Amino acid sequence: MAQNKPNAFMAFVADWRACNRFGRGLSTSEAVAKCGPIWEGMSDRERGPYKSKAKDSNVLERESKTERLNCPGVAFSKMQVEKNEAIDAELQMKRNIKRIVLKATNSMKLEEEEFLFVSFNYFTKALNGDVYQPAELSACRFSLKGGISSNYSTMINPGHIIFGQTSDAQDHSRTTHKLPLPPNAMGEKNLGNLYSDTLKWLSASNDEEDEQYDHPVIVYTTPELMPVVKSCFRYLACEGDTDKHAKKIIVYDICYLFLTLKKTVLDLVGVPSDHMNIHVTNSFFRRDFFEFSSGIACDYHEEVDRTKYCTKSMVLRWGYMISHYICGDLAIPLQPRKHVPIEVKHSYTVTPGDSSLALDGTSTDSGYSGY
């Protein structure tokens, strides 16, 4: 049996039921019987809005029938729009990273330019949306010359696990960070205060221009963690007094930052950089040869032998990796705890010059000029 097309009278019935407290308790047939006499007494002018609404509904129905859908019922056109938006966002991110590095280079402050690295652990991910429930947060402030100057780390107790996700959360915790689940989770329970404190710490390095024009805070993480970091910041922001701060944190790809820095530094010292690409820098991060360094994780993950998954260890290792592959080209001496873990000996020596950008700094047995 063919489905009846929307008509003006039924549009009126739906509107009457929505606006009439008595009508909400009636069935459709009862509402039709009640509205019949009212409809008959209405003029063409009064019926006009309902005729327009019915016409619009018929047009939308015809369009939906001709629209191609995928298996879950999502229109291909909508998927294409989302794909184009993602491509545009990635291109904008790359342009902004290049602009940041170029600005620091032109002002002769590339070595002092500070970058913020952020990582999250999570308990579970919602099945029907891009929502990650945060479990641990760490961030560090990094520059080529000073290495890691400060770090921020905290565990998070959201109070409860997303309904129906306890088993998934247990599996994820057991195979990764091994943090106890809510309500027995460790760390901060007031997520609103935690978000405010985190935003305050991240904003501490903003210069006068950033404060004057209310520029967003830019943080960097790995491509795999970008959706996690974005979602966890949104989760914390929703618990705050206001959501207006959510737009103040932008998450960028640390691998592309690494690529941009490396190519820029090689150009500065006159070394060809054509062989450098995103696949090379991604392989450096996947190699992660500081993964098993001791003394860089939080006390809890050191105790349970899960230092690899500790967010504090992650952000410190990212700083160490960038230092390892770039500082030698700029003749910057590696300082323990700032550029490398305290027990690691770097594989090159630096001959001091008038400036760390001077080319009389030499690198031996390091392979920096080759990468």
Swiss-Prot record:
Residues of the DNA-binding region: 2-68
GO cellular component terms given for this protein: cytoplasm; nucleus; P granule; perinuclear region of cytoplasm
Nucleus as UniProt keyword: yes
Pfam families attached to this UniProt entry: Maelstrom (PF13017)
Localisation per UniProt entry: Cytoplasm; Nucleus
Keywords: Cytoplasm, Developmental protein, Differentiation, DNA-binding, Meiosis, Nucleus, Oogenesis, Repressor, RNA-mediated gene silencing, Transcription, Transcription regulation
Keyword Cytoplasm: yes
GO biological process: germ-line stem cell population maintenance; male meiotic nuclear division; negative regulation of DNA-templated transcription; oogenesis; piRNA processing; regulation of miRNA-mediated gene silencing; regulatory ncRNA-mediated gene silencing; spermatogenesis
GO function terms (MF aspect): transcription cis-regulatory region binding
Protein origin, superkingdom: Eukaryota
Family affiliation: Belongs to the maelstrom family.
Function of the protein: Involved both in the piRNA and miRNA metabolic processes. As a component of the meiotic nuage, plays a central role during oogenesis by repressing transposable elements and preventing their mobilization, which is essential for the germline integrity. Repression of transposable elements is mediated via the piRNA metabolic process, which mediates the repression of transposable elements during meiosis by forming complexes composed of piRNAs and Piwi proteins and governs the repression of transposons.
Name assigned to this protein: Protein maelstrom 1
Species of the source: Drosophila pseudoobscura pseudoobscura
